[in-house]
Amino acid sequence: MRWWAGAALLLAALLFGRPAAAMEAQPVAYSEFIQDVQARRVAYARITGQRLEAAYRDGTVRVVTLPPGEARLPLVLMQYGARVEFVRPADPIAFRTLLRFIPPLLILGAILWFTRRTAGGSGGLLTMEQSPARLYRVGEASVTLQDVAGLDEVKAELQEVIDFLREPERYRAMGARIPRGILLSGPPGTGKTLLARALAGEAGVPFFSASGSDFVELFAGTGAARVRALFDRARKAAPCIVFIDEIDALARRRGVGAGGGTEEREQTINQLLVEMDGFDSGEGVIVVAATNRPDVLDPAVLRPGRFDRHLTVDPPDRKGREQILAVHAREKRLSQAVALAEVARLTPGFTGADLANLLNEAALLAVRAGEREIGWPQVAMALERVTSGGPPRRVRAAAADRVRAAYHEAGHALAGLALRGSDRLVRVTILPHGRGLGHTLFRDQDEERYLHTRRDAFDRLTELLAGRAAEALVLGEVSAGAADDLERATGLAREMVTRWGMDADIGPLRLEHAVEGEESLRRADGAMRALVAAAERAARALLEARRSGLERLAAALLERERLEGPEVEALLELTPGEKPYIIVANSRGDEGNQ
């Protein structure tokens, strides 16, 4: 900022600066000044154009404006003993020219200052062309495959890459070519970054880590320069691993989207393709990339010879979750009463990051409660916090809202018990959690299922609408409390019609991208509406058939606010595992199983 201050002072001096004598001089009339000259009071005079500065013998300074055409005054001054000095006046044209250049210079200085700041400090524009990757040298990436649990299939696929980095000559002698690139795809939190670090740690090679967004900049050519710099560093450090996280920010499909950054992004992708073509597997540089959205990647990036191997990293199954929990429990004081197998059973769909967060939340709750170790109550409370959007809020709802919430959650619980097959009801509560006034929680009791039939999807749709149906059945009207249920029901109906081919009228077509035109969109919209309406009728029929159970469950919720699964089954007089199946109307209006 020093040069800013200097520029400001210079501008002030140019605009407002004056000689010190002029700042102290007192103006005097021309006629009075002539009298002072004739009285020999003036000792010195300096004439600058029409301006005269006079130093009097008594030490004062006066300034006089000379009349036009006054040529005899210098002779008069010398005649009465005054010394005269002539000063050439400043050129006003040159001064105006200087003022004209000052604003552009100030603007240019501001741009340079802003560029230095956005480029990361003292490096300036040169910093933008440097590799954004962080280098982990051998030994710094202390993670190994032993620290990665629940991903046995993916680890087995990566083992030959590790062997190649350790003993490349064995593969070269056989004429085998190791994959140049490995793409890890899967939902967030499943361990893609951890796998890449473990790969480098296991092989004992340097590890370059960067994010796809690090290569994208405002200035044209910066992304391509950074890609070149990264691969230049990698070649010098070979054998090594280059890891690019969130590669969809860097290698998104070309030709999609518009705007000023499109050309820059395409230049960056082209440079990545050139670099991956420019080295062979013998150099020992292996590119590992991770993404949550492989569908948006450019096809040229995915072709063989670039990313040869595509590995899907899914959320772990029950056995994998138990292994992940065991890894995260190593550094925690976990009570013997906490069975990790039971925690794994209660957490279907959880990723590795979710499980780590669950145990950390339980540890925080144990510290808050003053416990010496993490017990089952803390784990159960942490699970409730994670699944229901936070701890119970200390909000006392109005009596009418509590009644409506009780019937709403009782409807969900009763429909879930009737329709969910082997799933187990964990709890139902009307204590406010997150943004809702209550929630109902089910968990898979047996093996997890990955393929769902049309009947499964329709039953789930019916359960989502059962809370709203219970409000309408008992209280006569619905409320805004079903907004989240409606959002999820709409999404499920859309999947059934446009992706899964579960509508008899639309048929086995995938209309996700609506390539069939407006008529197909209209028919799909009509099919979705019919499906949701049928599910709502089915939910109402189910609750009408078990109206007494609905009333008992709602009354118990109003009294106790929270009921565990076994308590609900006892209240409804169900034997453990019994499911009161009810035949309901399907989306076409006929009766029967779906």
Swiss-Prot record:
Positions with a binding annotation for Zn(2+): H408, H412, D485
Topological domains annotated Extracellular: 24-92
Active site: E409
Its EC number(s): 3.4.24.-
CDD domains listed in its UniProt record: RecA-like_FtsH
Cofactor(s), by name: Zn(2+)
Cofactor note: Binds 1 zinc ion per subunit.
Assembly notes: Homohexamer.
Function comment: Acts as a processive, ATP-dependent zinc metallopeptidase for both cytoplasmic and membrane proteins. Plays a role in the quality control of integral membrane proteins.
Name used for this protein in its record: ATP-dependent zinc metalloprotease FtsH 1
Organism: Symbiobacterium thermophilum (strain DSM 24528 / JCM 14929 / IAM 14863 / T)
Gene coding for it: ftsH1
